[in-house]
Structure formats: C-alpha cells, structure tokens
Amino acid sequence: MGSLGEVVEHGVSKDMLPFDGHPDPVVDELNRLENLLREKDRELGHAYSEIKGLKVTEALKDKAIAELTKELKKQDEKLSSLEKQLEQKNLDVKRLSNERKEALSAQFAAEATLRRIHSSQKDEEVVPFDAIIAPLESDIKAYRHEIALLQDDKKALERHLKLKEAALVEAGNILRSALERALIVEDVQNQNIELKKQMEIYHEENKLLEKSNRQQVLDIERLTHTIAELEESILSTGDVANAVRFYQNQAAKLNEEKRTLERELARAKVYVNRVASTTANEWKDDADKLMPVKRWLEERRLLQGEIQRLRDKIAMAEKSAKAEAQLNDKLRRKLKALEDDMRNESSNTSASNKDNATSKQATPKRSSSQPRRPIISADGADKRRPASQPRASVSGKVLNKQPGSETEAAEKNRHAAAKRFDSPRSAKSVAAGGRGERPVRSHLWAHRSKVADDAGKENKEQNPNYKAHLGDSHADGDCGVQCSEHEEAMDLRKLDEGKADDSDAVKSTKDSCEI
C-alpha cells in the first residue's frame, strides 16, 4: 500500500493539482484510507500477538490443569486410603471400647464378688483374701495396660484425623484454586473466541477496504481522464482568452488612435481657422470673396465626415469589447462550474460515476460551443473591417501634412481643392459610380461628401439667415473672419459633445473588462 500511495502522490502532485494551487482532495482521501489501513494492520498485529500470548497461556494452563488433576487423583487415592484406615481404626476403637466396657463390668463383678467374699470371710474366714485378689489384680493390670494402649491409639487416631482434616482443607483450597483456574481458562477461551470473531470482522473490513481502494483507484483513473479532458477544454478556453486579449489590445489601440485623432483634429481645426482667416484677409479686396470660404466649408465637411467615421469605428470597437466581456463572463462561469463538479466528484465517490458520465457527455458540447479564434492578418488587424471605413493611418497622414507657413498652406489647399474637383481621376470615379464599379477611394470620398452635405444642411437649418449674413459680411468685407469664427464655435461644441460621449463609452468598456 505504501508503494501505491507514493505512486499516486507523485503522479497526482504533478498532473492533478486543481486550479487554485491547493492539494488534490482525491490524494487526501487516499492518504486517509492508507492511514486507516495501516492502523488496521497494526491492530491486527497486536491482536495476533495477543492471540499467540493467550495460546501460550492456554497451553501452560492446560499443563497446570493436567498436573492438578493428577495431584487431585493422588489426593483422592490418599483420602480413600485414609478413610479406609479411619474406618478400620473406628472399628478398633469401638471394639476396644466394648472390651473396656466388658472389663469394667467384669471389674465391677469382681469387686462385688470380693465384697461378698469379704463378707463371707468375716463370717466364715474360710478362703484368704490375697489368694482371691492376686489373679484379679493381674487381670486388672493387663486391662489397664490395654486401656493405656487404646488411649495411645486414640490419641494417634486423633492426630491422624487432624492431619486428614488439614489435608482435606488443603485439598479443598486446591480444588477452589483449580476451579478458579478453570473459570479463568473458560474466560480465556471465550476471549479467544471473541478475538477470532474480531479477526474475522477485521478480515472482512480489510477486504472491504481493499475493494474500496480498488474502486478509488478506478475513480482516480477516471478522474485523470476527466482532468485530461478538462485540460483540453482549458487549453481551448486559453485560446479564447488569447482571442479576448487580442481584442482588448485592439480596443486599446483604437482608443489610442482615437486620442491621437482627437489631437490631430484639434490641431487641424486650429490650422483650418488660421487658413480661413488668412484666406479671408487675402481675398478681401478681390471680386471672388466667397470662393475660399466655400473651399474651407468643403474641407470642413470632409473633416466632419472623417470624424463621424472614426466615431462609428469607436462604437464598433466598444461593441466588440462588450462582446469580449460577455465571453469572459461565460468562460469564468464555465470554469467555476467545472471546479464545482471536480469538488463534488472528490467529496462523493459514489456520485462520481454519474458525474463522470454527465461530464463526458457535456465536454464535447463545450468544445463545440466555444468560439473559434479569428484569423489575424500579418498587420494584426481584423479582416472583418468594412471597406467603407478608412484606416486611421490614411487620415493621420492627411492631417499630419501641415506646411511650415500659413501662406504656403493656403496655396496648397487651393491647388488640392482644384485637383480634387478638376482632375481626370475624379471624373473617372464619377463615371465608374454611374456604371456601378466604384473603387474604394472614390467610395470613401463619396461617403465623406454625403456626410459633409448632411452637416451643411444641419448648419443651414441652425442658421436660417445664413445667406443674408454672408451677404452682409461680404458687403462689409468681413465674411471670411465671421464665418470662420461661427464655424469654429460650432465645431468646438460638437467636439465637446463627442468627447463626452466617447469618454463615457470608454469608461463603460473599461469597467466591463475589469469585471
């Protein structure tokens, strides 16, 4: 069991650690069961040693009982012989007592005869007294001698009886001790039977523990399979997490591009205001006073279209960030569910078979429901970008091209506007648009012109006296400056509103990502 525990510990410690870095509950359960088996083995060893000691004591007690039985038999034989001797001595005592009584009666009869003789001698004085008494005295001496012998025999018999009584007392004590030992032997035999029953119970428990150990080994193998499947699912979720990080990086890049574009827009607005003021001052004395203002308005409309397009791009990035946050939440919930399943499997081994069957049925569904990783181009950008959205690099290049002086900027704007409206490329693009084959560049400029037209309509709706105001300002010679100031104020308001909306959107996306 120790080797199996070591193998399981080495195998599980490297490959079966849970996600939180804590030890595996399956390994803890195996260690606990191994400790229980070791304790049961120790108890069995103690029981075996006790049984051996009890067997030795039983053998010694059997030998002692055999010796005691032999001694009891000898004592019984001695008692039987002593009883026979006592009976014989009692018979002798009775015989002697009868003889004594007879001797006493003969003595009394002799005394009576002597009295009669004395009385007759006194009367007749025929026979002498000594002649009659001498044989009787000899008889009396003989009887007295026999009586003394009988008394000695009686004393000896009394002593022998006392010795027999002491021997009987000792034999009774020996019998009591033998009975006590027999009771102890019976108790030991009962304990031996109980220990045998406990041994059988321990053997059955050992068999059950071995079966449970085998079942747990099978459960561990199943858990290793499920852990391998979970690792595969975690790797797939890692791919999804990489995709989520990629989209988060894209969102961060888009936010940075947004900030840079906002800065470039602010610089462009300042630059456009300066150009408008210089062009208005330059064209103040000529006949074509409204031409630079119209061109400035066109450039402004184009810039507003680019701003709107960038806002749409930011909105798309925010939507993608929200979708990524939702994916992250779903993946976290799935991981929590998987951890709960693992804990339930480790705690309830009986229910682990059912959970393994359900998890085996549920894992392919999870792998099929996981989103695919998007195909990323070499530049790191997503290929799902619509063709109508321009790249930030193009707008940055357009806005970053600022001349050194204000006069050179005004002249370049004039030439650029003339080339845009008078170049053959624009004519070709218009023709292609009529045929239904429009390139991406012309499509971008067409979209900008639409947005610019919408902005112009909004400006006209906001300022109903726009033409009258322009006429008055041109009549006074201050059209360019007033129009530029009015448009600058409108642009600042719109920029402030857009920045507030964008900052709220970015905060919401950051909060969702952090959650």
UniProtKB/Swiss-Prot annotation:
Subcellular location(s) per record: Cytoplasm, Cytoskeleton
Composition-biased stretches (Basic and acidic residues): 409-425, 450-461, 484-515
Any one GO cellular component localisation term in the record: microtubule
Comp. bias regions, Polar residues: 345-362
Annotated stretches, region: Disordered: 340-515
GO MF term (any one): microtubule binding
Keywords, sorted A to Z: Coiled coil, Cytoplasm, Cytoskeleton, Microtubule
Coiled-coil zones: 26-106, 136-351
Record-level GO BP terms: cytoskeleton organization
Region span, Required for targeting to microtubules: 208-410
Source organism, top-level taxon: Eukaryota
Low complexity compositional bias, start-end: 364-374
Keyword Magnesium: no
Keyword Lipid biosynthesis found: no
Biological role stated in the UniProt entry: Plant-specific protein that interact with microtubules.
Family to which this protein belongs: Belongs to the MAP70 family.
The protein's name: Microtubule-associated protein 70-4
Name of the gene this protein is made from: MAP70.4
